[in-house]
Amino acid sequence: MSLKPTNALTMINNLPDVPSQVDICITEQDLGPATKFLPAVEEYAQEDVAVIFCDSDKIYDPNWAARLINAAQKNPDCAIAEEGSDLRHISIYNWSGTSVPRAERIKKDLKYRLRRALSLGRWKPRKNVASGYVDILEGWGGVLIYPRFFTKQAFDIPDCAWMVDDIWLSGQLEVNGIKIWLTKDEDIRTKGGQNELETPLRKQK
């Protein structure tokens, strides 16, 4: 994590207890949201190790990391993500990569809307229904990368991209010729929200 001087002491004094196998690293440079993976990329730049990152405000199922690792073994030269989009789905630009097969998105047709309505909104499927390539990875679903996928340019983040690490990371992968493979081996949706309830409990343990 990266801490600014004004709140560094407070944060350090309130770090949670973690297992002995876990290290909490505090970096000198604040790279925005990308701080959760770029320092690891730099530290292990000369090693052939996988770096897995995610968001801290989500709940991940026990098999989440194993799925990313399994997908990486089948696609060793790709970044692996469980959530992602093509550029045309999230921007005004009608462009997408040419690598096939593309990840297939769920069709929000009448059948989809009826099922959502009948479940009173509780049925929330993943937006992708089949594995394939995407233009933009989405870190909240979990991502596996290798340090060799990046150059020093990844650390020179412009102001306009400082808060959009998914876009910046995906762009760096594209520049370096690395494809993004979205894996959809299991129909498990990453959950959020519960963390707000669990955080106070963790602090009391």
Feature roles, as predicted:
Residues 2-49:
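Active-site-proximal specificity loops/subdomain of glycosyltransferases
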Residues 59-157:
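Conserved catalytic core of nucleotide-sugar-dependent glycosyltransferases
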Residues 47-59:
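Short beta-strand-to-loop acidic/aromatic patch adjacent to the donor-nucleotide binding site
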Residues 1-5, 85-87, 186-187:
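Short beta-alpha junction loops
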Residues 47-49, 76, 178:
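Short coil/turn segments at beta-strand junctions that form active-site/ligand-binding loops
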Residues 8-12, 91-95, 195:
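Short aromatic-enriched loop/helix-cap "lid" or pocket-rim segments at secondary-structure transitions
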Residues 56, 145, 165:
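A conserved hydrophobic position in a structured secondary element of the catalytic/binding core
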Residues 156-205:
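C-terminal catalytic/acceptor-binding lobe
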